[in-house]
């Protein structure tokens, strides 16, 4: 895997806004903020700051990578709009990484850390990783990732298969909305240890009490996009900057405010 490049990484799919710069396969600068409703004001600023920290400009970078979702409608639009603006202005290519792929990369980092620094919430191996994004109430956007490509299981698409070439895990179910109850993901929990990770994991821990279930409540971070972004860039999976749209999973539904103006 070629690592001789620079990639700007933008992650705004949840309440955490983060931007990172990767140089030659290493995160060289990073910014994040969980300030409420600050994505629009901070994302472009963070991009400027990580470039300035390294003494380079956008012209010195090879591409821009953005989280494509699923996630917050507003957050995704801010990230994608910023990334597209950078690409339009510089002529740099755009690559996109699924939010769940980022969470799986974070999970692998947590597992690797647990091998040397034992923790109560993370073991040293999982049959499945189940990343999930909070979709409000008891709903999450989730998919199941397996540590190998089992001969009896078909990888869901070419992108998932490409990601599996470098990652230890591959996606084996479609990304879908799930209403969580005590029986959710039972077929996977019965097969062995499962790690639930993401900003939807916490509420699952309240209802899924299976002994094979472990939970990490966290937000996806731009720094964890390094590996999937590098894979997308190496394989030239570039997006059409003019027409690229986030993967919302569900259509946005506008509601009428109940607050009275007068």
Which residues fall in each region the model found?
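Residues at secondary-structure transition points
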Residues: 34-42, 73, 77, 81, ...
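Acyltransferase
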Residues: 214-262
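Conserved hydrophobic/aromatic positions in well-ordered beta-strands
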Residues: 20, 141-145, 247
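N-terminal beta-alpha supersecondary unit
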Residues: 2-68
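DPxDG-like acidic metal-binding loop motif
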Residues: 66-99
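Stable alpha-helical structural segments in soluble proteins, enriched in small hydrophobic residues
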Residues: 50-54, 89, 107, 222-233
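Surface "functional belts" at beta-alpha junctions
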Residues: 26, 93-220, 253-254
